[in-house]
Amino acid sequence: MSPWLKWHGPAMARLWGLCLLVLGFWRASLACPTSCKCSSARIWCTEPSPGIVAFPRLEPNSVDPENITEILIANQKRLEIINEDDVEAYVGLRNLTIVDSGLKFVAYKAFLKNSNLRHINFTRNKLTSLSRRHFRHLDLSDLILTGNPFTCSCDIMWLKTLQETKSSPDTQDLYCLNESSKNMPLANLQIPNCGLPSARLAAPNLTVEEGKSVTLSCSVGGDPLPTLYWDVGNLVSKHMNETSHTQGSLRITNISSDDSGKQISCVAENLVGEDQDSVNLTVHFAPTITFLESPTSDHHWCIPFTVRGNPKPALQWFYNGAILNESKYICTKIHVTNHTEYHGCLQLDNPTHMNNGDYTLMAKNEYGKDERQISAHFMGRPGVDYETNPNYPEVLYEDWTTPTDIGDTTNKSNEIPSTDVADQSNREHLSVYAVVVIASVVGFCLLVMLLLLKLARHSKFGMKGPASVISNDDDSASPLHHISNGSNTPSSSEGGPDAVIIGMTKIPVIENPQYFGITNSQLKPDTFVQHIKRHNIVLKRELGEGAFGKVFLAECYNLCPEQDKILVAVKTLKDASDNARKDFHREAELLTNLQHEHIVKFYGVCVEGDPLIMVFEYMKHGDLNKFLRAHGPDAVLMAEGNPPTELTQSQMLHIAQQIAAGMVYLASQHFVHRDLATRNCLVGENLLVKIGDFGMSRDVYSTDYYRVGGHTMLPIRWMPPESIMYRKFTTESDVWSLGVVLWEIFTYGKQPWYQLSNNEVIECITQGRVLQRPRTCPQEVYELMLGCWQREPHTRKNIKSIHTLLQNLAKASPVYLDILG
């Protein structure tokens, strides 16, 4: 064997790999302090021998200390001190536990840089005193101090005060050693001249004009004598303070309008605790228009603006230099108010070319005014020849409300020669005869068509030719439309509340090999696909269109024994290829086996001729995303009449637990949805919610998807890191999506990460960022969301436990179902 093969063959490659692995473990162990063990996020030192004498520090170029979230120290009798710089490197630290050790002293600034600390446990140490200054800047959930030999003094009186005023430390039996070296319950501690301080400001309210100066005075008192300091937050204006033992003053000069609404506090602090008195600063200033842009189209046309001013400015619009009189079709809407800043828009309902022009906004209050102008173009003037033909009659485009040229038009008609008038008269006679003949023919044709329609009321489905509207029964949700080949049908995004009906397809569901490997003999008798006669299906109107084909609202006869006909949603197959037909039949078998009260019901198929048809139950109120938006705080912007009632928290919990129930069922059947979102859930009567996906959502909600390559559309805003990076879809990835669905529900249908582009969303999710808690979301539900969004799939909450928790929360709040009317 050659020397090269001897040292570079496959066996040696495995040996080198093993050596590198051992070297990696050895290097990691060297980086961790003696008597401690380390991981990427945790340090624990529990071996008493040889033990540690100082707070553990990581070696340079080892694990990043910023990633450490928990430090556990136990049985370290020689650890006595935490110095100022011992903990500062662990800025991500959340849990610090030092128990059964020799800790005697903690430096005042030991935790100054550990703002993420939430849990501290110093049980059974040697602490005789502990100052509140260690913890005053922290938002602690737990501070456990039992088993320490505290000395009865004013230094620990703050612990007694803390127990009396708050629930933390919870149910702790704290003791201190009195002058006789006997244990005394901290609750009974009485120390003379040891009480809380007081602080008082001279003025409870402060109003000043921009650019002026003001001086605040504060007096403090208490025993022990407190320290006085000013908490000015992020005050922009220049300021300076002077303090003595019991008096202090704060002078603010050249006050900025940016400081209006900010709070200024005078704080008195001593060993026992602190007291503060606050004043709100109100700054009056002239208005400025900081933002005015060209109109954008959403539910209405909107010219967006932002105005600053205090007192609130009066707004006036001008159109082409003249005062714009607002009405219900053109009006100012203020959407967001932030003390002195107003975000809104000039809303225009269906503007035309008549509304094109210059729009000027003027904002005015007692301190001044500001104005800005924008040019708006909503649509071109009618008539395709206008732009290309300079001789096109200008009179066609005169403003209908300006009759100044009527006389000119009459004068021009008088200039026509008499011979032209005679020719025109002859042409008019011929036109009259032609109109009479055409009207007679049309009337006869209409009569024949009415007779044919009456005879064909229950005739064949008619999908090969134009699909007609058969009936107006049971369909008060929106007007019916005639649907024909080549005509423009109403899109699903423009329809009524039932505009989008979506059901499970092969696209978002990973094929279950256990299911597709079975034979017909293995299927249960009640799960065979039901075949529906084509003449029993009568179309009413088109609901939408996806990549697969169209979805129609229809009436289906003889489907249920107890009803002559029921409303259904039918999905047609556009692609008639052999592969598409095979997929169609496989999907039908799959859907037949998915039977649950919170999964959209699949009735069967129609395979008599083309196109192939799937029949699903009809959910009256359409997709959940539109339903949430229509019953949220912004519904007034979309409603044409009285806005619907806003969803309550209990109703949102009721919706959430139904979706979770459906996902528990899918997981039990070993199916992965891959596209769980509110747009793919449907709402029926009495707030009944079911999971589905007809695939139309990729067209209606195109901004929710991220195109990869030529055809693949991924819902990245609902996907976990492993699905984005490795296309790995599991039940755990569905759990992540369920967490996002909960976020959608409690934001009334907002798009996740709506303020970010798709690329920014991918970066955020892969870097570990999560969505913030919605304003209306209970803390328990947000913690549930966080449990769904754990980076490691195996650490995410179990789908059954999610459903159980949501079910319990929903039961605790009764649901009133009259919201749907």
UniProtKB/Swiss-Prot annotation:
Swiss-Prot/TrEMBL catalytic activity: L-tyrosyl-[protein] + ATP = O-phospho-L-tyrosyl-[protein] + ADP + H(+)
Domain of life of the native organism: Eukaryota
First and last residues of every LRR repeat: 92-113, 116-137
Keyword Amino-acid biosynthesis tagged: no
Record site feature (Interaction with SH2D1A), residues: Y705
Tissue expression as described in the entry: Expressed in the brain, in neurons (at protein level). Detected in hippocampus (at protein level). Widely expressed in the central and peripheral nervous system. The different forms are differentially expressed in various cell types. Isoform GP95-TRKB is specifically expressed in glial cells.
Residues with site note (Interaction with PLCG1): Y816
Main location: membrane
Record-listed ATP binding positions: L543, G544, E545, G546, A547, F548, G549, K550, V551, K571
UniProt region (Disordered), positions on chain: 474-497
Keywords, comma-separated and alphabetical: ATP-binding, Cell membrane, Cell projection, Cytoplasm, Developmental protein, Differentiation, Disulfide bond, Endosome, Glycoprotein, Immunoglobulin domain, Kinase, Leucine-rich repeat, Membrane, Neurogenesis, Nucleotide-binding, Phosphoprotein, Receptor, Repeat, Signal, Synapse, Transferase, Transmembrane, Transmembrane helix, Tyrosine-protein kinase, Ubl conjugation
InterPro entries on file: Cys-rich_flank_reg_C, Ig-like_dom, Ig-like_dom_sf, Ig-like_fold, Ig_I-set, Ig_sub, Ig_sub2, Kinase-like_dom_sf
Membrane topology designation: Single-pass type I membrane protein
Family: Belongs to the protein kinase superfamily. Tyr protein kinase family. Insulin receptor subfamily.
Protein name: BDNF/NT-3 growth factors receptor
The species this protein was found in: Mus musculus (Mouse)
